[in-house]
Amino acid sequence: MADVNKVVLAYSGGLDTSVILKWLQDTYNCEVVTFTADLGQGEEVEPARAKAQAMGVKEIYIDDLREEFVRDFVFPMFRANTVYEGEYLLGTSIARPLIAKRLIEIANETGADAISHGATGKGNDQVRFELGAYALKPGVKVIAPWREWDLLSREKLMDYAEKHNIPIERHGKKKSPYSMDANLLHISYEGGVLEDTWTEHEEDMWRWTKSPEDAPNVATYLELTYRNGDIVALDGVEMTPATVLATLNRIGGENGIGRLDIVENRYVGMKSRGCYETPGGTIMLRAHRAIESITLDREVAHLKDELMAKYASLIYTGYWWSPERLMLQQMIDASQAHVNGVVRLKLYKGNVIVTGRKSDDSLFDANIATFEDDAGAYDQADAAGFIKLNALRMRIAANKGRKLF
């Protein structure tokens, strides 16, 4: 094995990363620093400290990154109305660049010459972690155990843990049949019965949201206040970014909002089925498009929509720290200078319905758009010349005998 003196491990305290911790110590004979991120996944992160200490780890980092995650990653992404392949709100993808950033920061702080993660060799996360790491620290060594070892099943991992006295419970509360990932933006489910694309997901799989059928029979109204494209208040109460998202998750979940069952194209080449709960993000996307509808110039809005697919792909495939993503972000952020105002929404049984939008920066002029007498604000006779000029190229083609069908 290559010389490694100290490695920073992205550590959850679960089976996989606990085995990786011991495997790194034995295989590389190196010191391991553990890093556990609180991204709002809803699980207690402190037990990871005790587990790491029990395995001889001296430097343990447990960081609350919830505000940074939403402020510097989720909100910038939503300024672009980002959706991958028309549906996926990128809840897993957008968390990886922050984890990579913090891994490198800790490596620099502790003098570590390597980082390690628990992503498998089949998925997108290995790419996301490592592209970010190399962008931020080109000379860092990355250790990806799933690409090196032969512990390729859960049973083998359990046997390894038992053999090496790793503090993992073999018997305890029932384990979910799904591979799950959660943060403040979403929770995902993969594997198990979902690997059959014809099998319907089970109702008891969902953890954050009520079934739309069981959601309240009375609609919930709320108002979101925007400043420069970001939500700053809910029902007039100013909130931090993480509090905004957590509150929308709760309200959206109660109203059956944000469930998704999709098959997506992974960067590594395969198709993968996943189920997602993104209640707050679903509300945010609808509301942001609503406030932009009255504050953005038409051509700016259309250009943003054209760029969004590329921007979404960059995030999905792990290029958050790339120069092209940073360039696009500057354009997107510049477009948000006048995206200010309030959006009123009605939430009802899985639906997010826009019922109002207002802004001091609104480009909607009722005097011009009215169906009533506009008192000369718009001269309808001007439309004749506009239409003739725009039809000119088609008239020329027709006069040349070009056939359309």
UniProtKB/Swiss-Prot annotation:
It comes from the Bacteria. GO terms for biological process: argininosuccinate metabolic process; L-arginine biosynthetic process; urea cycle. PROSITE patterns: ARGININOSUCCIN_SYN_1 (PS00564), ARGININOSUCCIN_SYN_2 (PS00565). Pfam families: Arginosuc_syn_C, Arginosuc_synth. Keywords: Amino-acid biosynthesis, Arginine biosynthesis, ATP-binding, Cytoplasm, Ligase, Nucleotide-binding. Its EC number is 6.3.4.5. One of its GO terms (cellular component) is cytoplasm. InterPro entries: Arginosuc_syn_C, Arginosuc_syn_N, Arginosuc_synth, Arginosuc_synth_CS, Arginosuc_synth_type_1_subfam, AS_cat/multimer_dom_body, Rossmann-like_a/b/a_fold. It catalyses: L-citrulline + L-aspartate + ATP = 2-(N(omega)-L-arginino)succinate + AMP + diphosphate + H(+). NCBIfam families: argG, PRK00509.1. HAMAP family: Arg_succ_synth_type1. This is Argininosuccinate synthase. It comes from Pseudomonas savastanoi pv. phaseolicola (strain 1448A / Race 6) (Pseudomonas syringae pv. phaseolicola (strain 1448A / Race 6)). The lineage of its organism: Bacteria, Pseudomonadati, Pseudomonadota, Gammaproteobacteria, Pseudomonadales. The gene is argG.
